[in-house]
Swiss-Prot record:
The gene is aspS. The record marks 33, 83 as: Important for tRNA non-discrimination. This is Aspartate--tRNA(Asp/Asn) ligase. It comes from the Bacteria. It holds the Pfam family tRNA-synt_2. It is found in: Cytoplasm. Its EC number is 6.1.1.23. Residues 199-202 are annotated as: Aspartate. The lineage of its organism: Bacteria, Pseudomonadati, Pseudomonadota, Alphaproteobacteria, Hyphomicrobiales. It comes from Nitrobacter hamburgensis (strain DSM 10229 / NCIMB 13809 / X14).
């Protein structure tokens, strides 16, 4: 018999009755029922009930065991007594009568419980992550993550992609988020950077004659904490393709993403035919560029009904052509208590309030707005929104460029409060036609809106002759249930177009050469048309595991202060290490 086990703790069935077996694992739970000890023994594969009564030769040893001790148990498999079977366990028909116990690893008193899923302070969970990972839900999430990554790889290869690994030590770029810098010992005063993404390398691969690349790429960004991203590092399914247009990328990616979601959705419906929603339309209907399409509430422009009306606040706003009034339908929300609650919520979000109209049983409108604009305008709004008695509508007004984010939050809040969001499906969509540029109010200049390497729609002609703020890019995102899970674009592969694109954003050709010299040089030697994207592995796994916390799907994450509490990082280093790197510390004074 093997030194530690003949079977795993999830393997034994009623077909193993009367066999002598050996199991090794952790003491998950120990119970004393009238002098009979029941030990639930757990390993990676499952859990088996083991029994020692006073007649067992191992009873004295069993009495010494405590939670999370690692033990080897020898014994005989037998059927559980009638009525004590556990249908929730694959091993629930049998138990092991213990003949011998060997303690392989005793455990100190636990700083957090492994048995059960009770909430515990996050810092304790992260400091003792090796214990936290023994808990069933988190353990299963990590296993699911591995299976999802395997599925991604398999499906990418089925689409003709080949996996490459790009460098981890690369050059720093001042664009985007802050880099994690790595000092060079051999080149004093110079630094490598950990890649924020393999963007330039994957484009260089296309210029090197490769056709379809992918990798599960680690990415590093020295960003301030964000709720939707782990500090420090994250992983993405990165891909690039040569000689493609936007539709070719969509055709290659959709089967991969749809297939992964269908495989791990646990029966929940997954979008078959992805809609393509222009960026401007997404803001207009949903108040966000990552809409949750499970929410059926759609915003509409109702400016015409308030222009010249008796509600002077909106009427005066609409004298400025850039201002609009948007309505968010609230089916079933036509009570004063509900409308007042939404108004209070808006004030809590820093807004002056949230205007509303309610429709009574007779069909007449009620509320301050209805009283000011009159029954005809109120009825016209009801008909436009398709509402009925007992419903309400909520209104935001002003410059859409300034209020669309709040309008999107209000739409989401209404969907949640009215319980109209179907939580049991995955709604995937493409968001397309992103603006190439945006106006930076702080610096009073035109900036890139998203990826600076994207191809402008209309090419060099658009860059030369069009108002930059009207140029759209071949840039696209994948959204799912209110999250952006992937982003990409067709690349600007012509050097003259690349230089012009950066010039509009305030960078000269010398800046381009200095910051992106390797790729710019490659453009001079025959660059194919190419495009690609990257999908956030962490967010995909988070959605499929049914959690909203990225730490629940990551092995050893940092806390929100970018600290690894288990390993003690970041940490001090020795003066000798600093001298070797020619670094002297100049720390802020407390």
């Amino acid at each position: 018999m093997h030194r530690y086990r003949s079977h795993t703790c999830g393997a034994l069935r009623d077909s193993h009755i009367d066999q002598t077996v050996r199991l090794s694992g952790w003491c998950h739970r120990i119970r004393d029922h009238g002098g009979v000890l029941f030990i639930d023994l757990r390993d990676h594969y499952g859990l088996t009930q083991c029994v020692a009564d006073p007649d067992s030769p191992a009873f004295a040893q069993a009495e010494k065991l405590r939670s999370e001790w690692v033990v080897r148990i020898d014994g005989k498999a037998r059927l559980r007594p009638a009525g004590t079977e556990n249908p929730e366990l694959p091993t629930g028909q049998i138990e092991i009568y213990i003949n011998e116990i060997e303690v392989l690893g005793p455990a100190d008193e636990l700083p957090l419980p492994v048995f059960g899923e009770q909430e515990y302070p996050e810092d304790i969970r992260l400091k003792y992550r090796f214990l936290d990972l023994r808990r069933e839900k988190l353990h299963q999430n990590i296993m699911t993550r591995g299976a999802i990554v395997d599925s991604m790889r398999k499906r990418m290869k089925e689409q003709g992609f080949f996996e490459f690994q790009t460098p981890i030590l690369t050059a720093s770029s001042p664009e985007g988020a802050r880099d994690f810098l790595v000092p060079s010992r051999i080149h004093p005063g110079k630094f490598y950077a950990l890649p924020q993404a393999p963007q330039q390398y994957k484009q260089l691969l296309m210029m090197s004659g490769f056709d379809r690349y992918f990798q599960i790429a680690p990415c590093f960004r020295d960003e301030d904490p964000r709720a939707d991203r782990l500090p420090g590092e994250f992983y993405q399914l990165d891909l690039e393709m040569s000689f493609v247009e936007q539709d070719d990328v969509f055709a290659a990616v959709e089967p991969v993403v749809t297939g992964v979601f269908e495989e791990f959705a646990k029966g929940k419906p997954v979008t078959k035919n992805w809609p393509r929603i222009p960026f401007a339309e997404s803001l207009r209907k949903y108040g966000t560029d990552k809409p949750d399409l499970r929410n059926p509430l759609l915003m509409q422009d109702v400016s015409q009904h308030f222009r010249g009306s008796g509600f002077k606040v909106f009427a005066r706003m609409l004298e400025d052509s850039k201002n609009q009034v948007w309505a968010i339908p609230g089916p079933g929300g036509g009570s004063r208590a509900f409308c007042d609650r939404m108004n209070s919520w808006a004030q809590g979000e820093g807004q002056p309030g949230l205007g509303y109209i309610m429709w009574r049983e007779g069909g007449e409108g009620a509320g301050p707005l209805a009283n000011n604009i009159g029954p005809e305008r109120t009825e016209a709004i009801r008909q436009q929104l398709g509402l009925k008695a007992g419903d309400a509508a909520f209104f935001v007004a002003g410059d859409p460029a300034k209020f669309w984010k709040f309008a999107g939050l209000a739409r989401t809040k209404l969907g949640e409060e009215l319980n109209v969001i179907d939580k049991d499906r995955f709604e995937l969509a493409w968001i397309v036609d992103f603006p190439m540029y945006e106006y930076n109010e702080d610096e009073k200049k035109v900036d890139f809106s998203h990826n600076p390497f994207s191809m402008p729609q209309g090419g060099l002609d658009a860059l030369n002759n069009q108002d930059p703020l009207t140029i759209k890019a071949f840039q696209y995102d994948i959204t799912c249930n209110g999250y952006e899970i992937a982003s990409g674009g067709i690349r600007n592969h012509r050097p003259e177009a690349m230089v012009k694109a950066f010039e509009i954003a305030g960078y000269g050709e010398n800046d381009v050469v200095e910051r992106f010299g390797g790729m710019y040089r490659a453009f001079q030697y025959g660059a194919p048309p190419h495009g690609g994207m990257a999908a956030g592995v962490d967010r995909v796994v988070m959605l499929l595991c049914g959690t909203t916390n990225l730490r629940e799907i990551s092995l050893f994450p940092m806390n929100q202060r970018a600290e690894d509490l288990l390993m003690g990082a970041p940490s001090d280093v020795t003066p000798k290490q600093l001298r070797e790197l020619h670094i002297r510390l100049n720390l802020p004074q407390d």
